[in-house]
Amino acid sequence: MKVIIASQNPAKIAAVESAFNLAFPNDTFSFEGVSVKSGVPDQPMSCEETKQGAMNRINNAKIKLPNCDYYVGLEAGIEGNSTFAWMIIDNGLTVGESRSSSLPLPPQVIDEVKKGKELGDVMDEQFNTDNIKQKGGAIGLLTNNLLTRTSVYQQALILALIPFLHPTRF
């Protein structure tokens, strides 16, 4: 089965691959990341905007690569002083959704994000890292790598897969 991931971010792709392989150990998947627009600002600043970005990514991936088995949209955002992400999975018949855990951000980080910077760029500046958003993410930095962007996204993706694990109940 072909799974299209509406992102080329390695951390997001790894999370999707892991979640699908754990949820469906007897199935064989091929995964492809595709670069598509979210249709929202680079740094979404509300829950609604973030969720819309994930859905827009799926819709744009369907246009770019039609007739695949699953489409997965992931979008990270900020609301208040926390960051989180929406996961949406669509197979044309069923849609599964889940929001990740929320991660509190330091006030200095929030101040810079409110000036229009992306969270990943701010984290790189303040923690002297390079392209952290494609690695462990802010989550990895702030939890001393007890959690990573991939591990937190994997959990949320498994929750979004529940309707596909129990299709007769949804």
UniProtKB/Swiss-Prot annotation:
Catalysed reaction equations from the record: XTP + H2O = XDP + phosphate + H(+); ITP + H2O = IDP + phosphate + H(+)
One Gene Ontology term of the molecular function aspect: metal ion binding
InterPro entries assigned to the protein according to its UniProt record, in alphabetical order: ITPase-like_fam, Non_canon_purine_NTPase, NTPase/PRRC1, YjjX_NTPase
Pfam assignment, any one: NTPase_I-T
Example GO biological process: thiamine metabolic process
Known cofactor(s): Mg(2+); Mn(2+)
Entry coiled-coil feature ranges: none
Binding note for cofactor: Binds 1 divalent metal cation per subunit; can use either Mg(2+) or Mn(2+).
Keywords: Hydrolase, Magnesium, Manganese, Metal-binding, Nucleotide metabolism, Nucleotide-binding
The protein's Enzyme Commission number: 3.6.1.73
Gene3D superfamilies: 3.90.950.10
SUPFAM superfamilies: ITPase-like
Subunit field text: Homodimer.
Family: Belongs to the YjjX NTPase family.
Function text: Phosphatase that hydrolyzes non-canonical purine nucleotides such as XTP and ITP to their respective diphosphate derivatives. Probably excludes non-canonical purines from DNA/RNA precursor pool, thus preventing their incorporation into DNA/RNA and avoiding chromosomal lesions.
Classification via PANTHER family: NON-CANONICAL PURINE NTP PHOSPHATASE_PRRC1 DOMAIN-CONTAINING PROTEIN, PTHR34699
Protein name from the UniProt record: Inosine/xanthosine triphosphatase
Organism: Aliivibrio fischeri (strain ATCC 700601 / ES114)
